[in-house]
Every structure is written in C-alpha cells, then in structure tokens.
Amino acid sequence: MALRSPKSSRGLSQDPTTRRIWFGIATAHDFESHDGMTEERLYQNIFASHLGQLAIIFLWTSGNLFHVAWQGNSEARIKDPLHVRPIAHAIWDPHFGQPAVEAFARGGGLGPVNIAYPGVYQRWYTIGMRTDQDLYTGAFSLLIVSTLFLVAGWLHLEPKWAPSISWFKNAESRLNHHLSGLFGVSSLARAGHLVHVAIPESRGGHVRWGNLLSASPHPQGLGPLSAGQWGVYARDVDSSSHLFNTSQGAGTAIPTFTGGFHPQTQSPWLTDIAHHHLAIAVVFIIAGHTYRTNFGIGHSIGGALEAHIPPGGRLGRGHQGLYDTINNSLHFQLGLALASLGVVTSLVAQHMYSLPAYAFIAQDFTTQAALYTHHQYIAGFIMTGAFAHGAIFLTRDYSPERGRGNVLARVLEHKEAIISHLSWASLFLGFHTLGLYVHNDVMLAFGTPEKQILIEPVFAQWIQSAHGKASYGFDVLLSSPNDPAFNAGRSIWLPGRLDAIDNNSNSLFLTIGPGDFPVHHAIASGLHTTTLILSKGALDARGSKLMPDKKEFGYGFPCDGPGRGGTCDISAWDAFYPAVFWMLNTIGWVTLHWHWKHITLWQGNVAQLDESSTYLMGWSRDYSWLNSSQLINGYNPFGTNSLSVWAWMFSFGHLVWATGFMFLIPRRGYWQELIETLARAHERTPLANLVRWGDKPVALSIVQARLVGLAHFSVGYIFTYAAFPIPSTAGKFG
C-alpha cells in the first residue's frame, strides 16, 4: 500500500480516521515528533526554514515595490505629499457597480483603487526614492535576493552543505554574527545610505550609482575625518525654514544632535537619524566582539554563567547549569527571542507615532492609526508565543536533576508566590478600576457629575515634567528654567527636543489627565491578568502539588480531560487559549484609548476625551457611537462609500469571532454527534453521495477544537476591532 500523508509519521499515515488529516496538519512543523528525526537534522530543518522565510519576506517586499511602481501614484505624491492620497494598487472586481466604481476611484487613479496605509510611500520618499524607475529597480533587486535565500535554504539541506550540530550550538559565534553582522553592519549600512543618498536627496540633490563615488556628502570631504575634527561634520544644520526635497534652507551637516522635529515634515531630522544609526552600529559591532570565538579573546558565556554564584547564598547555585539548559533547548531560545521581539514590536508601535521617522507620515493620520493597531496586535501574539514555548521547554526539555538549586529551579519552587502575587495585582487593578468607572457612571446617571472620582495622574505628570514638559507647573529638572540640564539642553545637546516636548500639536509627550488614569489601570489589569494566566500555564506545565510531574505519568500532551485526574488544570495549552482571549481584549483597550486620544488631538477637541472618558457611557456614546456613523453607513439601500469594505469586515468579523465560541465551549461528544449526523445526511443525499472519502469522520479532540476556536476568535476579534479605528480615521481625514 502506498504511504499516505503525512510522510513524517508512519503511524499517523495508517490511521483510518480523519484524525490523520488534522493531526498531520497540526504536526507538520513539529519537527521533533517526526519519524527518524535526529537532533542534527532538526537544527538543519529549522535553519533552512529561516532562509525560506527570509525569501518569502523579500518576495513580499518586492511585490509591494512592484505594485506601487506599476499601479500607484508615487511620482504624483512626491509633488504634493500632504494632499495626494497614496495608491496601493488597482482593484479589478466584476461585482463592482457604478456607485462602487465611483466610491473607490480615489487618489487620482483612473479607476477603483486601494489607498495605502502601511507608510511605505513615506518610507521610500524619506530614503531617497523619487521615481517609479527607482521602485522597479528595488523590486527587481529584492527578487534576486529572495531567490538567493531560497537557493541557500535548499542548499543547506544537502548533505555536502548542511552545517553540523556543533556549528549550531556555538553560541558565541552566533552572537558575534547576529550582534556585529546583522545589527551592527546593517545599522552602519543604513547610516551610510542616509548620509550618501537620503540626506542629499532631501536637500534637492540626486545621488545614484552613476555618481555615488563622485558626489561628496560633505563639502570638506574626508579631510576632517582624517584630521580628527569630526565636529566639522555637525556644523551648518538644516534651518527651520528648510523645504524638504529642495535646497531652500538646507545646510551641509551630516550627523547632528539637534532633537525635535523638522517643522515641515514633522519627522525627526534625517541627520539626527543618521547619527543614531552610526552610534548603534558602533555599539553593536563592539558588543558582538565581546564573546570568545575563533581568536581566543573575549568572554565565554558558559564560563561566565558557571562562575555567577551570588555570594549571599540566597540564589542557591546561581546560574550554574543554565548555559547547557538554554543552549540545548530550541524552545527556551525561541521563548527568549519571542519575548524580546514582542517587546520591540510594541515599542515600534509606540515610536511610530511619538517619533515618526518618515517624512510627512505624522500628518497621514489613517496610516498612523493603521501602524499602531497592526504593531500592537502583532506584539501581543509574539509575546504570548514566548510563554507558549517556555511551557514547551519545561514539558519537553527541562531536567529537574541537571538544574537542581539554580535560579531557574528556584523560580519553579516559588511559583505559588509568583502566581498568587499576580492574582492579587490583577484583582486589585480590575475591581478598583471597574469601581471607579461604575461610580462615575452612577453619578452622571443621577445628575451629580461633580461627585465623580477624578484622579490626576500626578506621578506620570511628574515624570513627564522631569523630561521637560512644562505645562503641568512642576518646575522640576528639565522643566525648570533654573536647572543646569535645562540650559545645557538649549545650547549643547538636542536644542530642539524641549520645544517638541512642549508642543501640544505632536504626540511626543501627550498631555494626560483624569480620563487617562482609569483606562491606564484597566490596561494594567488586562496585562497582569494575561501574564497571570500565561505564567501559571507555563510554571505548571509539568505538574502541580496535586501531580508532581505529569511527564512521568504517561499522559498525552497537553491534557487528558477531567476523567483521568484533571490534567487539563495543569496544561499549558489550556492556559494559553484564555490568555490569548485576555491579550486581545487588553490590546483592544490599548488601541481604542490611543485612537480616541489622537482623534481628538487631530480634530482639535481634546476636551471631549478629557470630559467623556471618565465613565463608561462616555466611551460608548462619545467614542464608539460618535465615530461609527460613516462606517455603519458604508453600504445601505441608498448606495455605498469607500468605507464599505471596512463596514463589511466589521460585520463579518463579528460572525467569525462568534463562531470561535462554538468550538471553545462544547465538548468532544457534541462534535462527534454532529459529525456523524452530517456524514449520515451526506451519504443519503442524491448527487452529494457521489463524493466519498476514505477516512472515517471522527470529532476533533478537545485540544484541536480549542485551536480552531482560538483561530476564529482571534481573527474575528481583529477584523472587528481593527475595522473601527482605521476606517473611522479614514472617514474623517482620508
């Protein structure tokens, strides 16, 4: 008999039921579980997957460039970046009636088009791309790079070129490559591109391959560099009257320390950004060489960890044994990487609006809303993934004997204290915040709004004041005219920063008040609850006091239901899916607070948020309802507008989200009955019964059903929530 799929598992391929299909999909990338898998082959497969993923990323970015060059309006937008709406691509849809054709014909396009909200137009403009030919060249170049990575992935699976296990486990060399090579050299390349191409373009010049070596980025060339007079390069900065993309008001400085924003583009000065990338390059290139590689100089990470035993004795064996624990567990390494990447992605969301690096992106409000929403949701999924792989590490890779007495073992020994403290914090934040909101709602409902509990966030205001925001009147550190740092900031370093901080038209230091206080604590409640569920799920992944080590009891991973001792209670997967529920809710609050804060700032009516965000009816009425009018009329019996696709997504998102509960709540018996009923009906229906299948239909397991439920819940939630801030902004500002 021919071997059926999945070829990775002989046992599963011989399963006569539909379990073969679903388990085959579920374990397709679980290389560890595949037949005949060795540790070396596992590392090689993952390495090849990395190269394949990079190939897909470069192909995707190539497609962005190509479609904008082909169907976009980049050259028209460069002439008027504040008023011409950027086109992502054309829409060809046979279902479009004349009202839809007219509604979607925007941005100077010849027919229906999609408007681009990811900020790529602003990015390409900032880095010096000025023509469609530039975009085509970039698309073709990235297509070549994508092909190279695809070939590299295939090549490194061939026995002759496949790296050995020792190569993968050489942590010092990997850090050297990642820190110095990827971060350091790429930052240096970025600084070089800004200095040689982007900054000259912003000053009305034009540098391409033909004149790259002859066009000096500074009038004095390399003279000051060789003479050690580096300060020369920072003199003669662009003036406040500089018109971007022209020589009017332009200076000659390359790396600067000006601070603040370019008055016209409302983005940080390009010369400041070049200086930043140069500094990052120096730091990371040095950092990557602090570890011992082939040359016998620098630190051994293993040696440093083994020697790190705190003298007080309160941390037991300290970090002994951690090097081997981490270096031999891909799940531990992935957990650390995902935790770091998740935090960085959330920071990107925050910096996209507070320090908008690309020219004119700060004035494209819908793009700001889209980028913030996108990056916060991505960050949430990545961070929950960190906990998931931490739990898998404990389940599959952790050896209590090898790590006995070190810091990781002590964390596990203290897990009851960790979980109970997180529980206390979550309960405190949740009940007090809800109490504040409900009290304020009742006071307004009873006609006594003056009896609301309004709390000024004085600690946060003090921190903002210490950094230079003078409007609160704290007169402390950088907000005090008598402070030495204040005076130094006016002349020596970042002279434009304090002006930017005190400018209420940007988002650098948003003014905060009593409306921000409860929503901040609501978000804190959500964050702590998510962390509580994830931490408990990971820390209890192997067992609890009831069941000391689940791994030794022969149970399947992750959970065998209440009938066999209640192991679902100590299942990381069963903690993971309610944690994703909480993560999505929390980011919903984060995103909607950000959006209301900014939409009132952009419209010039910040008092609306200040007055209405202190009670729940204010949120429902003055934010949700008030900003939904154009959206809920995206399509109606009288016609359609350009928000109709978002209106449809909003409705469809609710349906997908609700479908998720159908999988999350019922148990396996319900599904088995439903499937057998459907199968029986199918086999007795004329024509339909001509289609047969070889596998006996069986219900999804609890774990699989929860995965299907979680996928629907997550996708539906994001379709519902993201389809509010983005189009409601577009309806007001385009």
Swiss-Prot record:
Chlorophyll a B3 binds at residues 662, 670. It is found in: Plastid, Chloroplast thylakoid membrane. It catalyses: reduced [plastocyanin] + hnu + oxidized [2Fe-2S]-[ferredoxin] = oxidized [plastocyanin] + reduced [2Fe-2S]-[ferredoxin]. Chlorophyll a B1 binds at residue 654. Gene3D superfamilies: Photosystem I PsaA/PsaB. Its EC number is 1.97.1.12. GO terms for cellular component: chloroplast thylakoid membrane; photosystem I. Pfam families: PsaA_PsaB (PF00223). One of its GO terms (biological process) is photosynthesis. Keywords: 4Fe-4S, Chlorophyll, Chloroplast, Chromophore, Electron transport, Iron, Iron-sulfur, Magnesium, Membrane, Metal-binding, Oxidoreductase, Photosynthesis, Photosystem I, Plastid, Thylakoid, Transmembrane, Transmembrane helix, Transport. Its main location: plastid. The chain crosses the membrane at residues 46-69, 135-158, 175-199, 273-291, 330-353, 369-395, 417-439, 517-535, 575-596, 643-665, 707-727. Belongs to the PsaA/PsaB family. This is Photosystem I P700 chlorophyll a apoprotein A2. It comes from Selaginella uncinata. The gene is psaB.
